[in-house]
Design a protein with these regions (language model features):
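Short alpha-helical scaffolding segments that buttress acidic/His motifs in well-ordered protein cores
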Residues: 35-38, 48-55, 68-74, 103-104, ...
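Secretory/endomembrane lumenal or extracellular ectodomains immediately following the signal peptide
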Residues: 1-63
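Conserved alpha-helical segments that form or flank metal/cofactor-binding pockets of metalloenzymes
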Residues: 61, 65-68, 73-93, 97
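Conserved small/polar residues in nucleotide/adenosyl-binding loops
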Residues: 181-184
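Acidic/histidine-rich alpha-helical segments that form the ligand environment
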Residues: 105, 113-152
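Preference for long, well-ordered alpha-helical segments
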Residues: 145-172, 177
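Histidine/lysine/aspartate-rich catalytic loop segments that bind and position anionic ligands
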Residues: 91-101, 106-107, 111
Length: 184
């Protein structure tokens, strides 16, 4: 990776605004570089964290399927950081290592119907910026309208995050280097 355009903050040298934003992450262990970078813009970070928290922890999506979508959009956006970080989160959400690798191939292959639809919807959102009528109708057989809204916002959120991570050059955290994004 090239030198970051925006260097993450030094955890040992935080101003009051950054410390306030990062305190929950500090309490839970060392904050990841994404948070140390975004804390350089405290107003943005405060507001983004509310939305991010909804998408990752409070949405109506089942965690496993949420991670299918996040990993797929991370892969499609070629976001090394997103892919590495969510391989861990996806595994914690119940995805097997083989499934995580299969996400690279998209909705084709040996997925159950719901998994295939989640991946297909993610691909459609990436390519067309909307879910097709056919995919939407099929997903409604499994999920509520609120869940489909959360799916759209999850894919949008992680598209945005992938863009920021790549543009800012956020470096991989030390513990993520073994989980690098490798394209075919």
């Amino acid at each position: 990776m090239t030198e970051p355009k925006i260097q993450p903050l030094d955890i040992n040298n935080l101003d009051a605004d950054a410390a306030a934003i990062l305190q929950p992450m500090i309490d839970a262990g060392r904050p990841w570089n994404i948070f140390l970078t975004l804390a350089k813009h405290p107003d943005l970070a405060k507001r983004w964290l509310v939305f991010s928290n909804h998408v990752l922890f409070k949405s109506t999506l089942p965690p496993r399927e949420r991670e299918l979508a996040i990993l797929r959009i991370g892969w499609l956006c070629k976001s090394e950081y997103e892919w590495a970080q969510h391989k861990i989160i996806g595994s914690d959400a119940g995805l097997e290592a083989e499934e995580i690798e299969k996400i690279k191939d998209g909705p084709q292959g040996e997925w159950n119907q719901l998994d295939s639809l989640v991946l297909k919807a993610t691909d459609e959102l990436h390519a067309e910026k909307q879910i097709s009528e056919e995919t939407w109708t099929s997903l409604l057989e499994f999920w509520t309208e609120q869940q489909l809204m959360d799916l759209v916002f999850a894919v949008g959120q992680y598209t945005l995050v992938s863009m920021a991570l790549k543009t800012f050059g956020v470096p991989l955290d030390d513990f993520l280097t073994c989980l690098l994004y490798t394209s075919p």
